[in-house]
């Protein structure tokens, strides 16, 4: 799949990122991950991101990363394209990128580098180096320490033909409008704020109709139904989903930092697809919080 074909795929439909399965000892659980992918793939996501932020990329060893990407690519070979999360320091990100390409990933989601303060010129140089290390398509994720401007993105687009996507995790509407207007159809644009459904209607109005769904991991039917309501501009249905599910969900998610990942793993366990615990420094939901989530999920009906 060439970068432009990937761009076309990412320009419509719902995207998601499977959680990564760990056993009770916290090690990668391949059989559970395969079962998860086989369950989720038929629901109709346009693409899946393996070892992304919700997949706890930041906590994976290099050897685990290779096994996770290979498992995802092999399991979904005939059903849905797999993009691999990559990140960290530049040379580390390049190693991950080249390994994901070797293993058959159709594209990359370039996560922000970790911790080190840097100018956005430096961040742009980091993005360019990763893009030029591979031939497959790359989506850059503006979030946290990565705050690329329209001018820098335009320069990167000229230098890196395989940079085909922009994912927004900042929620800076002025910046998003500026990027969308400046870059036009050069990129596919993805909404990437935590629990992106809450912002989906607003982002669609900005020209960003595609987003990645975390709740697809445990209420996939609801996630797809909500996406279709967004796509057909059914504001009444969208409002009902937000009132009945997403706002109560946020009340649980917002209780602790890091729960944007932890609550997804809790939901997967309640749905019968236990992915094991999150790894430190994240913490799992308490039993009371899991009960609250289970009651909320039960109200949504069979998935």
Swiss-Prot record:
EC numbers for this chain: 4.2.1.41
Keyword Lyase: yes
Catalytically driven reaction(s): 5-dehydro-4-deoxy-D-glucarate + H(+) = 2,5-dioxopentanoate + CO2 + H2O
Enzyme class, UniProt record, top EC level: lyase
MF GO annotations: 4-hydroxy-tetrahydrodipicolinate synthase activity; 5-dehydro-4-deoxyglucarate dehydratase activity
Pfam families per UniProt: DHDPS
Cell cycle as UniProt keyword: no
Disulfide-bond pairs as recorded: none
Keywords of the record: Lyase
SMART domains membership: DHDPS
Pathway: Carbohydrate acid metabolism; D-glucarate degradation; 2,5-dioxopentanoate from D-glucarate: step 2/2
Classification via InterPro entries: Aldolase_TIM, DapA-like, Dehydro-deoxyglucarate_dehyd
GO BP annotations listed: D-glucarate catabolic process
Protein family: Belongs to the DapA family.
Name of this protein: Probable 5-dehydro-4-deoxyglucarate dehydratase
Taxonomic placement: Bacteria, Pseudomonadati, Pseudomonadota, Gammaproteobacteria, Pseudomonadales
């Amino acid at each position: 799949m060439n970068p432009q074909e990937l761009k076309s795929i990412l320009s419509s439909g719902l995207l998601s990122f499977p959680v990564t399965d760990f056993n009770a000892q916290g090690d990668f659980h391949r059989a559970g991950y395969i079962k998860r992918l086989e369950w989720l793939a038929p629901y109709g996501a346009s693409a899946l991101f393996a070892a992304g932020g919700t997949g706890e990329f930041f906590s994976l060893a290099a050897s685990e990363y290779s096994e996770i990407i290979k498992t995802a690519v092999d399991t979904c070979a005939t059903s849905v394209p797999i993009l691999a999360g990559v990140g960290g320091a530049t040379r580390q990100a390049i190693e991950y990128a080249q390994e994901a390409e070797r293993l058959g990933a159709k594209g990359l989601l370039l996560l922000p580098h970790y911790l080190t303060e840097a100018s956005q010129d430096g961040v742009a140089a980091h993005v360019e180096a990763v893009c030029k290390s591979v031939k497959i398509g790359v989506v850059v994720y503006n979030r946290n320490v990565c705050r690329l401007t329209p001018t820098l993105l335009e320069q990167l687009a000229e230098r890196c033909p395989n940079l085909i996507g922009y994912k927004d995790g900042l929620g800076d509407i002025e910046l998003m409008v500026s990027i969308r207007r400046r870059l036009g159809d050069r990129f596919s644009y993805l909404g990437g704020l935590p629990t992106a459904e809450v912002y989906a209607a607003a982002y669609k109005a900005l020209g960003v109709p595609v987003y990645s769904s975390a709740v697809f991991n445990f209420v996939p039917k609801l996630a797809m139904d909500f996406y279709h309501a967004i796509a057909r501009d059914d504001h009444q249905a969208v409002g009902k989903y937000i009132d009945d599910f997403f706002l109560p969900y946020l009340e649980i998610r917002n209780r602790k930092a890091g729960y944007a990942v932890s609550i997804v793993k809790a939901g997967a366990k309640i749905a019968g697809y236990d992915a094991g615990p999150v790894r430190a420094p994240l913490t799992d939901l308490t039993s009371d919080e899991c009960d609250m989530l289970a009651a909320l999920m039960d109200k949504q009906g069979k998935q």
